[in-house]
Amino acid sequence: MKIALRVDASSQIGTGHFMRCLTLADALKAGGAQVRFVSRHMPEHLRGMLVAKGHEFIPIKSSPSGTSDDLPHAAWLGTSQHADARDSLEALSDQTWDWLVVDHYALDARWESLLRKTVKKVMVIDDIADRQHDCDVLLDQNLYADMDTRY
């Protein structure tokens, strides 16, 4: 099974997202999966963790396009969702992926639907429920009384 993970991290935000994706990737790899991380922002010490664990890492280069999206956390992406989708597709274009796991507050259904060109299934990890998703599996690790109507 081939699984790609799209997650960013920095010294200010996203390290928790990275760590939960790394934990998932470790378990998937132990089960025989091929795992690739795709990231626009990733500090060297976190990249080092990926390399040490034998995970593939593809950096997405910075893109000149501005953040024109209407999401509350759009600025965290550093570019538009469309530009990021294009760059992510390029990073994954060498093969077909069984799953894409997305853990990013600045990405929504618009981005996810564009990535369906190269992935069979999409899983989104989201714990703030402030945007729509185009996914096969949505994971919110928190317990809420309104979980049935939250998304």
Which residues make up each language-model segment?
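Cofactor-binding loop segments of dinucleotide-utilizing enzymes, especially the Rossmann-like FAD-
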Residues: 8, 40, 127
